[in-house]
Structure formats: structure tokens, C-alpha cells
């Protein structure tokens, strides 16, 4: 605790870091405030059916990412997910389309063009998702619209308001990245997830302590122990890397010698991160979408696929997560390109020939890392369902695993590392080191 307080003091002493933290808090507060502003013409008291619909499936994922704005028909209801979807599409295009591959290799100018295309695609997705959201709102909560207002005339301005709200969130995220601390888009998603935690925790405590005579207190303690263990395991494994040694040939320029030092390529255990879970959840949502717009009787198999606690649902879910982990790792890490870059810079892996042998070696290492990584991601993905077996409330069970846990762990670690780097630049230690002012030795080391 003393170390934490000392780190906060150090953060306040560094003027640039203090300003960045205050800007980050200001923009996140603006985002949370906007999440409570309901669309004009909507009666928030009539949104019960929409909120019950977001209790499971992809709807719950969207509601979680938006911090409850989705189920509250807020101006920020669509959240940052359209931009995330556009970014994923652009990542896939950068692998499959030569034009976007070329842009990636053009450095800063290419990155700006890709960002421009991403924004254009985001706007296109918004003008598809916004009417879809409003149509679903009309189906689930038709009484929510104020009397005297026609849904037909409400749709057009509401579509533009929802689109503008999402683009404003994107602007907030970019300002946090530029002038604040951490990745702004990731922080906004994390804030949306954390916003649901207090209510979920209170509901879980209430449900357990009403059954205190039947062992509710013991089960609650067991839940907290399991949650702590899963979070610790997630932190350790998300930070896990395999360091592949790379030796660079020596070069002599004038009287100076360059190269010759051994460096490392860090291959992460979770190269795909949270993306396989998002892809798998999107596919598992398809049966629910079919049932919602179908009037026929639902088959028993489809009923099992609609129940996220059934054995069939979770088996299919695990297979999809593992498959998407291999797929996403394959498209984001290119061993052939890595081997070519290494050869171009006169680098080589000790004991491995440059070129094709190096590419094969890197691919073998990646395959060995992807298998345990995919299994752990699959385990994390079904942890909320396993928590349900302990009668954990669904709202609190989401924090036992799945997308929410991996995002929280990743964003918190990334933000702490950025704060740490700001402190070290001013010769302070932070949470990851001892909390004191660095002396001359620290300056020399840096």
C-alpha cells in the first residue's frame, strides 16, 4: 500500500504525467456522462424488454462494451464496436490485398491512409448498424417512443445521432491516446466493462447472503478465490513470451563496429489476444438471430445452441475459439516476412540457415505456442459458463473469463507500463519497481 501511495505522489510530481492523467480522467468522465443520455423521444422507463434481451449472447457483449448504453438506448448505444469491426476488416485486408500490404510498408504515410479507410468503413458500418438497432428497439420496446412521435420520422434523426455518438467516442479515444495515458480506444472499452462491475458485484453479494444459512458465505469466498486465481493466471500467461535469439553480423564503418550483438524476437503465447473469442461469439450469435426472426418451432439441437450453459453450446464454442486462434495467429504473424526482414538486416537465428529454414523454424515455434495458448483462451472463454454451475449470477459471471477478463488484464497492464515509462523518464520508479527517486545509477542505467 505504501508503494502504491508513493507511486501516486510520483505521478503528481511529474507535471506532464499529471496533465495526461487528468485529461484521461476528464475524457472518460465525458464518455460515461454521455452513456446516460437517452435518445430524444425515448422513454427510459419503457426499455425493460430491451434490457432483458441483452442478458445473453452477442447482445450482452455489445451492452458490456458500451457500459450499459446499448440497453439504455443512449446516444452512445453503438459504442466503439463499429470502429473495432472496421479495424478487424482492415487487418484482414492488409493480409489478403496487395494494395493494403503496400500501405503497411509505407510507414507513417501508409498508416494515415489506412486510418482514413478505417474511418470511412466505420461510417458505412454505422449507417447499417444504427437502423438495425432502431428496428430491434421498435420490435422489443415499441412503447418506449413518446406518444405522438412516429417511428418512421424518428428513425432518420436517431440514425444520425447514433452515428455521431460513435464517431464522438472515437474522437475521445484518439484524444486520450494523443494527450492522455494508455490506448484511448482500449481504455473506453475497459471503462464500459468496469462500469458494470459494481452492480454485478452487489447482485452477487445479495444473492449469496440471502442464502447464508445454506452456505452462501462459503460459496462467495470460494468464488472470490477462483476469480483471483483466474486473474493471476491470465496476467502471467498474457505476458508469456518465447524469446527467439537473433544474431546480427558485425559491420565496421570507419573506426566503429556495429552489430554483432544478440537480440531476441518475442513471440507471444497469446498472439491473437481476445480476437478469437469475439469471432466465436459472433458466430454463436447466428442461431439466436435466426430464431428471433423465425416463426417456426425451434428444434431441440437449436435450443441447445441457444443455451450458453449447455454442453453442446460450449463444445462448439471451444472448437471455434481454438480454430480462430490458429487462423488469427496465421494472418497476423508472417514467418516468411519475418525471415526476409531478418536476412535483409544481416540477421540470423543461431544454428538455423537464413531464408526458408528460418521461416520454417519460426512457424514451428509459433505452432508450439499456439496450441497451449488456444487451449487456455478456450478455457477462459467458457469460464462464465463454468461459473454458472456454481450458481454465480450471469452479470458477475462475465468477469470470470471471456472477453471482459482478457480486455481488462491487457488494458491495465498496458496502461501501467506506459505510466511506468513516464516515471522512468523522470528518474522515478513506479508500481513495477521500488517506489523511490532514482539516483545517478538509475540515470546512467536509463
Where do the language-model regions lie?
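N-terminal cationic and glycine-rich segments that engage phosphates or anionic surfaces
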Residues: 1-104, 109-446
